[in-house]
Amino acid sequence: MAAGKFASLPRNMPVNHQFPLASSMDLLSSKSPLAERRTDAYQDVSIHGTLPRKKKGPPSIRSCDNAGHSKSPRQSSPLTQDIIQENPLQDRKGENFIFRDPYLLDPTLEYVKFSKERHIMDRTPERLKKELEEELLLSSEDLRSHAWYHGRIPRQVSENLVQRDGDFLVRDSLSSPGNFVLTCQWKNLAQHFKINRTVLRLSEAYSRVQYQFEMESFDSIPGLVRCYVGNRRPISQQSGAIIFQPINRTVPLWCLEERYGTSPGRGREGSLAEGRPDVVKRLSLTTGSSIQAREHSLPRGNLLRNKEKSGSQPACLDHVQDRKALTLKAHQSESHLPIGCKLPPQSPSMDTSPCPSSPVFRTGSEPTLSPALVRRFSSDARTGEALRGSDSQLCPKPPPKPCKVPFLKTPPSPSPWLTSEANYCELNPAFAVGCDRGAKLPMQAHDSHEMLLTAKQNGPSGPRNSGINYMILDGDDQARHWDPLAVQTDEGQEDKTKFVPPLMETVSSFRPNDFESKLLPPENKPLETAMLKHAKELFTNHDARVIAQHMLSVDCKVARILEVSEDRKRSMGVSSGLELITLPHGRQLRLDIIERHNTMAIGIAVDILGCTGTLENRAGTLNKIIQVAVELKDAMGDLYAFSAIMKALEMPQITRLEKTWTALRHHYTQTAILYEKQLKPFSKILHEGRESTYVPASNVSVPLLMPLVTLMERQAVTFEGTDMWENNDESCEILLNHLATARFMAEASESYRMNAERILADFQPDEEMTEILRTEFQMRLLWGSKGAEVNQNERYDKFNQILTALSRKLEPPSGKQAEL
């Protein structure tokens, strides 16, 4: 550059400036010793332009000028002497010199070389340290805020960074863009583990990304790393590699990527969940050199590639079309957008994810709720016709907005005799509006009679999610006028078909003081030692499967799934308690279900904390309880009792028993692994409303009832505050899942009943085991004959203190341990 642009300048002519030409040329040379000594003087040099810029104010005195600033020429530097020797002035005496802008040789100007490498070299350590600190101060869920994340570095570089066993770092996968790799050293060997990335599509409009190695999945990579580092958990069972020492980066991510030449190209959408917010960019319908210019103007070295949007509406992040073929210059307007223009074919390297088929980008403010929704233009629109006007006039008649809450299940078509407004709270006669009850239907008499018989046998009919056909319940003598067989029915059958309004129960089905027990005296004190010992012996002497069968049998009776009489069905208005808990008059049943669940959880906790013997005895009791939970989950399908056991095991009074859990891992290793790897993740799935995805309905006899009844009766439960899923960021989505599960439970109540009967077909109950598992017995055992009648809130608060005292008695807290 120096030889080409400044070779024609005179060397010995007097020039009225403070610096010789060589001073300005020194800025352009990457090998000049002067430039190396004064990098700090050019920190504010911009790399975004190639034209010289004039500084405001008096010229600054540079640190390299030690001899003062006079108009007399300075001693030439070696670089200046070389230039003069190459181009002597006497050889060019006859030439005419045409100078450029007079400010070109002004010493206050700085020439900038547009060089990425020079820009990196000019960055001082203080500036890099400041940028690194800015990255580390981001949100803890942002991958860039963790120093063990090194971005896009090569595999060999990562292997050189881990030197000792336990060292680890996380980097981007260069062979599989969008994925991440954990590099660590174990047994003096560098190992690479790909972090599996799974996209869970909870609905058409919402999806989430989870990361995992083998078993448990996490919502973010920082959460995954924290779990494996904090618990010293092996990355894989085969390798046994354990990570505990992070290798931290010392420079910003962009510097690492530029240093190793691994700056990402297009298609880095894979890590959207971890990166920066999207940047709104305008689009263009022109192609050519502007595409390449826009490509080079994009910031490089980011963790994430920015998704492109159009106008003011949020584009769908799952299916963003590669906009390389269609870009919009900044000076162009959206006034002339052709309809039906055909996109150029995509190259194989481009993203081939499905995208909306409309060639016109959305520019309004209507949100995209589902990637599957495609704009439909009217058939009379001609191909290539231009739409003129503002953004709101791109479509003559905007399509209707989709429903923001997608239907989880298509409702069944209503029956001819049921109105669309019929619901559980309306027990009205089931004739269509405007239908004359006395009118005969000669053409449909036979068909209607067959429909009545079918409804009497099968139960569910019409849009109601009930097992009882309300036409039969609501029918009266006038409705029978067109039924050919109604005249032949006797009075007894007429009584059975008469409508009986459902009863609003106000008294609990649990009456501890009226409970006749063979093991308890008429009056007993709370937590009697002899009775606790006898109950523990029964629990120890029976097999885990037998105990699970007894629990299922009692649960089915409490939830009114089995052994429900016809009178009880008529008083409920439905055929199953799974339907009743979804209805307004099922409040008392919901309270009873909550009572049994909490009482059962407290009883299991007392069974563990009441072991005053050796540490091995407590570990054995814990092992037996976990085995019962496995049987309830796999063999019995009793998710209600399973959740009660998991609630007991996750109480703070139980989880703090470190010695007990350590003894369980030593003596019952397989059980401990089963609890950590299978039961806890499965319990989390249940409480997030995803059991329909992971649990086949044919294997469930008693579904998970607690989320629904707790939502409907929140003011009655203060034992544990909010549930675990209510503190989740996706609590609204989980709430919708629980409500959809409640609808499914009401519809599939008959299926649950058949599953329970099949599982308990050959069951022979033991009287004493059945008694100790009944709610009335447990209430009297825990609170005594007098305390069992006290209000729920008082009973739970007092017993919470009792459990805390028992836990501290078994394993006294250390001085540094926080209180429960």
Swiss-Prot record:
The keyword Acetylation applies. SMART domains: RasGEF, SH2. GO terms for biological process: endothelin receptor signaling pathway; epidermal growth factor receptor signaling pathway; insulin receptor signaling pathway; lens morphogenesis in camera-type eye; positive regulation of cell population proliferation; positive regulation of GTPase activity; positive regulation of MAPK cascade; small GTPase-mediated signal transduction. Residues 543-813 form the Ras-GEF domain. GO terms for molecular function: guanyl-nucleotide exchange factor activity; kinase binding; phosphotyrosine residue binding. Residues 148-247 form the SH2 domain. Residues 739-743 are annotated as: Mediates the interaction with BCAR1/p130CAS. It is found in: Cytoplasm; Cell junction, Focal adhesion. Acts as an adapter protein downstream of several growth factor receptors to promote cell proliferation, migration, and redistribution of actin fibers. Specifically involved in INS/insulin signaling pathway by mediating MAPK1/ERK2-MAPK3/ERK1 activation and DNA synthesis. Promotes insulin-mediated membrane ruffling. In response to vasoconstrictor peptide EDN1, involved in the activation of RAP1 downstream of PTK2B via interaction with phosphorylated BCAR1. This is Breast cancer anti-estrogen resistance protein 3 homolog.
